């Protein structure tokens, strides 16, 4: 796994991952109710204190209407990262819409999750190729990428 050993911004982390980390295609969509399945891949690495992720999405007409932290970003074009640091069944769910608005929770299952404090969520560095402003579905854009650095 790629290791970044200095301080950085989210765009710098994305460049580092592009140079140092292999790309992994995602071909599993867990939500059958969503028929649209864009091409998605990602790169992952870490620093001493952050998980570094870069998602690449194509074949999508991105939409980002949700603007509040821990809002229902699943209604927008979004990506997810699940992380379980211990073998106790508790996991973290990090969801981001295409402009980087996060929804972050932890717990043992989908119906038993607690939202992370918005002040803590705001420490996640994010950088989207689409910027950070809300957007409606756009026919002129068919791909986007998102870099996140999770403390």
What are these regions (language model features)?
Residues 1-151:
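Structural preference for beta-rich elements and adjacent junctions enriched in aromatics
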């Amino acid at each position: 796994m790629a290791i970044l050993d200095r301080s950085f911004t989210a765009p710098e982390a994305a460049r580092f991952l592009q140079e140092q980390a292999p790309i992994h295609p995602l071909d599993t969509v867990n939500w059958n109710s969503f028929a649209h399945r864009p091409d998605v891949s990602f790169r992952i690495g870490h620093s001493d204190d952050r998980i570094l992720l870069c998602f690449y999405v194509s074949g999508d007409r991105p939409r980002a209407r949700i603007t509040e932290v821990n809002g229902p970003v699943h209604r927008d074009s979004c990506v997810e990262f699940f992380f379980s640091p211990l073998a106790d069944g508790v996991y973290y769910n990090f969801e981001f819409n295409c402009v980087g608005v996060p929804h972050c929770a932890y717990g043992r299952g989908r119906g038993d999750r607690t939202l992370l404090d918005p002040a803590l969520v705001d420490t996640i560095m994010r950088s989207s190729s689409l910027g950070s402003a809300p957007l409606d579905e756009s026919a002129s854009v068919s791909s986007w990428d998102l870099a996140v650095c999770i403390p």
